Design a protein with these regions (language model features):
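Hydrophobic helical membrane-anchoring modules
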Residues: 104-105, 110-143
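Short aromatic-hydrophobic micro-motifs that form the base-stacking/packing surface
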Residues: 10-12
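Single, functionally critical "micro-switch" positions that shape active/binding sites
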Residues: 14, 85, 114-115
């Protein structure tokens, strides 16, 4: 039994290790001020998806005859880096998602996931390079 009370549960996914300093704090503040049940990390989502069936492709999320310009699409992609959920919602639904859901938009690097050895190697190379030098990552201190 817990000896202290809390209003929110924060899930941080270990397979999405790149996060800017302060981003999680800002996401929690946005969740509280917006009074939502769930807030999740996201990036802009603009691709057109096709599904292969046998030897043909079919559009999934658009009409090829009335295809919008990518700049006119405002969908978001759930990155899975983190979730901020009201405790009462989490226990009521036994799920991270309540009815009022909001996203916290991150950048491309925050959306990178490590699910394969290739992805691990890619992120490792990024961290060793100067590409993320000015990214202000939240990383453990070297000892």
């Amino acid at each position: 039994k817990l000896k202290y009370d809390f209003d929110y549960v924060v899930f941080i996914q270990p397979t999405s290790p790149l996060r800017k300093k302060g981003e999680l704090d800002n996401a929690i503040k946005k969740s509280i001020s917006s009074k939502v049940d769930t807030l999740f990390s996201s990036t802009d989502y603009k691709p057109f998806i096709w599904r292969k069936k046998r030897t043909n492709l079919f559009p999934i999320n658009f009409d090829p005859l009335r295809r919008k310009r990518r700049q006119k699409i405002f969908d978001v992609n759930e990155t899975g880096s983190y979730y901020v959920v009201k405790k009462k919602i989490f226990f009521k639904y036994k799920n991270r998602f309540g009815r009022k859901v909001l996203n916290f938009n991150s950048n491309f690097y925050n959306s990178l996931e490590i699910d394969t050895l290739e992805e691990f190697n890619y992120i490792e190379k990024l961290l060793k390079s100067s590409i993320l030098k000015n990214f202000n990552l939240c990383l453990p201190k070297k000892t």
